[in-house]
Amino acid sequence: QIPIAVSPFVAKDPSDRLLAETLLDVVMADLRRTGAFSLLPVGPQNPPLSDATTVNTTLFAQWRAQAADALVMGSISRSPDNQMEVRFRLLDTLRSEDLGGLALSSPVTMLDVRRSGHRIADYIYERLTGEPGFFSTRLAYVRREGANHVLTIADSDGENAQPALRSSQPIISLAWSPNGQHLAYVSFETGKPVVYVHELATGKRTVAANQRGSNSAPAWSPDGKTLAVVLTKDGVSQIYTVNPDGSNLRRLTRSSAINTEPSFSGDGEFVYFTSDQGGSPQVYRVRSDGSGSPERITFTGGFNARPVVSPDGRQLAFVARRDGNFVVCIMNLETRQEVVVSNGPKDDSPSFAPNSRWVIFSSRVGNRDLLSAASIDGRVRSRISLDAAGIRNPAWGKLP
């Protein structure tokens, strides 16, 4: 863990003190949940610091003496046109280096304060770990609201949850487009499963697959030009590819086995999927152009399903049955080594963060369905705070 001190943000107008406190809370909560940082207390003996504080050898030495490898300091103020101005700086106290910062301008709202906090945390995370942050991303999931199923979009910490679609019938299998502007999903609103592509900014929906029988499990290709879907129009479940507007339907798998739950590889060359062709549900892959024969990927245990490939193409998340529990596993696709990253007993629907270092998944806790997250090495596991229970089918959005 990296020892880091985050000094309270200075509110240049006392009336903005609550905004400054919220900004600090968001930044610290984001950093804390990664497990990569040790957040050091900033006691009253330390004078207030802001982006305007003079940076010199004395300041670096002061914070090194308090065991801080990094220091964050910033301020919040109002511009003449009543915009909120947030500024911060990040210091590497070990190397006595100024690592820069951001100057953010936005309307004066609590929502925008939270967004600024996420952007600050993204900057800190990337500069200190070398990996892109993921705090400014969005989550999609389905929650129960009485008799309704509500497709919901929220910030990465579960805050600012907004409904995108309400239906009396189930909504499942959410998948973000690579550009983050669309969601593909399956809706039962017509009395059968149909694949839709939903433009989030406008609410416009396009039918991507409504063939005879079942239409399910959409997955985007990395270039966003193609969806892999599962259809039963010719009998047992098979995988097809189709354009997001429903054109250019093409069959990908051909067997008497059930083939389902596709996920494209990071380079788009392969489609990973679940099949029972060997007698039990296992993960296979096939070339996305349909050439060659399927290759089996998982061999541990009698149930491995719901594969999803990380954005960088290096990891595979899937649901496995281990000792009677359903847990989320991560496989390194180069070494084929596996690690269990969840506790069970009923974990499902893994989805990678856009930096490929985290997964989100649904968990059954007692009689409640909640969202959980874990690092890909399984060392850090957490619940995502949400106001509602009955939450399923999470999907982690792309970087903005």
Regions inferred by a protein language model and the residue ranges of each:
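Residue position within the beta-strands of beta-propeller blades
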Residues: M73, L139-V142, H182-V186, T226-V230, ...
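Blade-terminus and WD-like Trp-Asp/Gly-His loop motifs, strongest in beta-propeller folds
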Residues: E131-T137, S173-H182, A217-T226, P262-F270, ...
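Multi-bladed beta-propeller domains
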Residues: D155-I172, H198-S216, V242-I258, V286-F303, ...
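Amphipathic beta-strand/beta-sheet edge segments enriched in Tyr/Trp
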Residues: T53-Y123
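Structural motif
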Residues: Q83-E85, A147-T152, K192-Y196, V236-Y240, ...
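Short beta-strand->alpha-helix linker/helix-N-cap micro-motif
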Residues: I2-L59, V72-I76
